Amino acid sequence: MSVEVGSKSLSPWAPEFRHISFRGSIARDRFVYGHEPWEGNERGKVTLSEDEESFLRFLFKEAGLDLYRYRLKTIKRRIGACLRTLHANSFADARRVVQQKPALLPAAISTMVIGVTSFFRDGPVFEMLRNEVIPTLFKGRYGLAIWCAGCSDGPELYSLAMMLAEMKLLHRCHLLGTDCRWDAVRRARAGQFDAAAIKSVPAELLARYFTQQETHWRVKSVIRDAIHWRRADVLTLHEPGIWDLILCRNMTMYLTPEASAALFPRLEMSLRSAGALVLGKAERPLAACHLSTVGPCMYRRDR
């Protein structure tokens, strides 16, 4: 990606973006937590049969994911949908289908690891981003690095990109959306949504930044081309980089307490000093993290 400033073309890694660093790494042993299957009380409330657990371990391993980082209750109730997606009558059949047709793995994983999002979700959050957070982050800087972790099929990051375009700041930002599901990243990159999905987009933004295509609406290239999309798991991404703003909303509701406890330090360490983190309404960073509340769902790194 490059941006135009007058007659000058800038890469996100041009000198004007020199405060954005992707060097170094976050050592895995700083975020070690238990890998015993579903520690704590959850195992006592919900159980898996040996066949269920064996298949799920296989499926998640094939996708490069750790089954035991996800809440068992959520995983168990999605098993039937996964088998139906693979047109399998048994776990042995399902395993064989994935082995013989690896192209079906993304669809199978998408039935197990779900993501719910929408355009301009939680209006006050976007109001604060526009009126306070973004202007503050831009003080003394040419550009910002913004990461949406667990981006699903993209509505939240597209919302932010449209807001930045309205502020005449989009060309000065490097935006990245990541999700552990291939299908979600593919849909996000396509930027195509049905009528139900775009109901929360203000009419003037819909007219300015979308093109209607029969029964669907597609985000215009001026917005699509400003965003990079990547398939990655935030829990294992080894070098997330240093970001000015991170959005990671409602992810912990799908994770075990141990995985959630590992997630918040990773997010904190991925923020620059005074960088901003946006979480879901019911999420709170660990007390040990150096993150202070600055507004609804909004936190700032203090060191």
Please place each PLM-identified region on the residue numbering.
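Conserved AdoMet
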Residues: 20, 24, 29-147, 280
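A short glycine-rich, Lys/Arg-flanked "PGG" loop and its adjoining helix->strand segment in the class I
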Residues: 261-273
